[in-house]
Design a protein with these regions (language model features):
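Short alpha-helical transmembrane segments in multi-pass integral membrane proteins
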Residues: 1-23, 80-152, 200-258, 315-380, ...
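Small-residue-rich hydrophobic transmembrane alpha-helices
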Residues: 52-112, 156-175, 287-353, 384-406
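Helix-terminus/linker motif at the lipid-water interface of multi-pass membrane proteins
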Residues: 31, 35-53, 122-136, 192-203, ...
Length: 462
């Protein structure tokens, strides 16, 4: 029995070496990014609860925008990688054009929305349960932060268009280097501008926003300048700006195959922010506690998120080569490994996570809420690892409609209604509500298990 289990679910050293060589650079890059985000969050947290909450709410809104951008570039990347693999540089150029158009269209829509409805969107997350006027102060800081952050949306969009195309050519170092430079710049400028160190004025939340915007421009410039200085490695740039068209066949293919993926990213992100809005009706303390908890959780969930993402790459390679049996075997082993690693990280987070809220300059009530939210997240995290791995297994076989149903439709049909009903129509405490809503992941685990087991994803597309 044990030997059978080991053969099916545990690989040899060569297997894990290949898997980890792919995953570790991605884990490190995301670890550095999230660590800087954590430091940024702490620095803003030193300013006070209202400042921290205002910034956290705006970041929730920008999170939806970011995922919309990722969805737009992912839709074209499905074809971009294959165009490059075939040596079809013109096709690769058309996918690049699509990314530019799609990301700039999304950005234009986001800026228009934030300009006209920004205050109203922020106010959705502000419920004054104690009558001390703190929500008005948080709204003011949120408006200040959003006004500056909008300036950084365009370079972010253009950078994603370039960086994803560069990665499709196998040149992953430059986007990673640009990201490291950006997060380092962001961290340094955060410290100088938030607190007014040296010649810099004390700008508070405006300083945090300005530091992020400057870092976005630096990252975009590094990537764009490198791409145009190395045209031989970036053949998709040939003719990219000498015309504006995309052949109808290519455009239709990208939209048909990529639209569910694009909508999935947007709807899932919107669903998650809606869940947060449901929690926020329980007061500003809840918003602040969730902000602290999510920042800490993001430090610990990097491992399972990146291990899960690698599944689509490794399994996709086997499927593309027609090695369907090997694809199923690798998938079983990688899912088990991802969950195993997540159990270790979750246990670590459960033990040490409670120490982090003490760093913040906020009330003991908020620190207590954050500690309990972190503990709940640690308990649920291994289940999230399994459903995440299941999602990328289905995606590796090109089942974009299935992943759309599995991810965003599940969020809107199960998670959002659960959060809304529990927050608005029960007398349960917020921690109990949070646990029950997070617990809906169990349903997703069961669905994911049967979907993966059905082998509906075992498809050779090329």
């Amino acid at each position: 029995m044990l030997a059978k289990f080991k053969k099916k679910y545990i690989g040899d050293w060569d297997f894990y070496q290949k898997y980890l060589l792919l995953a570790i650079p991605m884990i490190l890059q995301n670890a550095i990014t999230n660590l800087v985000s954590f430091l940024d969050n702490i620095m803003v947290g030193q300013l006070g609860t209202e400042q921290m909450s205002g910034v956290a709410i705006v970041n929730q809104l920008i999170f939806v925008y970011n995922l919309a951008i990722f969805g737009a570039v992912s839709a074209a990347s499905i074809f971009g990688a294959q165009y490059f693999g075939k040596g079809n540089h013109k096709g690769h150029m058309y996918s690049f054009r699509f990314k530019l158009y799609a990301t700039l269209l999304v950005t234009g829509g986001a800026i228009l929305l934030f300009l006209t409805k920004g205050s109203a969107l922020i106010s959705l997350y502000l419920t004054d349960t104690v009558g001390n006027g703190a929500t008005d102060v948080a709204l003011k800081y949120g408006q200040e932060y959003l006004a500056i952050m909008m300036v950084g949306l365009i370079p972010f969009a253009v950078n994603q268009s370039y960086a994803t195309n560069i990665k499709e050519t196998g040149q992953t170092f430059i986007p990673m280097l640009a990201s490291f430079v950006a997060v380092g710049t962001n961290a340094l400028l955060d410290y100088l501008m938030i607190f007014g160190i040296g010649p810099f004025p004390k700008m508070g939340v405006q300083g945090a926003a300005l530091a992020t915007v400057i870092a976005r421009y630096i990252e975009a410039l590094i990537v764009i300048i490198w791409a145009h200085m190395h045209r031989a490695k970036n053949r998709y740039l040939e003719g990219a700006y000498t015309g504006f068209g995309i052949p109808f066949a290519e455009l239709k293919a990208i939209l048909v195959k990529g639209f569910p993926l694009m909508m999935n990213e947007v709807m899932w992100a919107a669903g998650m922010t809606t869940v947060t809005q449901c929690y926020s009706v329980r007061g500003l303390d809840v918003v602040a506690g969730l902000n602290i908890a999510s920042t800490i959780t993001n430090l610990f969930n990097i491992v399972y998120l990146q291990l899960g993402s690698c599944i689509s790459i490794v399994v996709g390679q086997y499927l593309g080569a027609g090695k369907l049996k090997e694809a199923k075997d690798a998938d079983d082993k990688m899912i088990v490994f991802s969950v195993f690693c997540c159990v270790i990280m979750a246990a670590l987070m459960f033990v040490v996570g409670g120490f982090f809220p003490g760093i913040y300059n906020t009330s003991e009530e908020i620190k207590g809420l954050a500690t309990q939210f972190i503990a709940v997240s640690a308990i649920i995290m291994p289940f999230c690892a399994f459903s995440h791995a299941s999602y990328f297994t289905l995606r590796s076989g090109g089942k974009t409609v299935v992943t759309f149903l599995f991810d965003s439709v599940f969020t809107w049909v199960i998670v959002v209604p659960a959060a809304y009903l529990l927050a608005h129509f029960t007398g349960l405490g917020i921690v109990s509500i949070y646990f029950l809503v997070q617990g809906t992941e169990m349903i997703k685990v069961i669905i994911g298990y049967y979907m993966v087991k059905s082998n509906v994803w075992v498809v050779q597309m090329v």
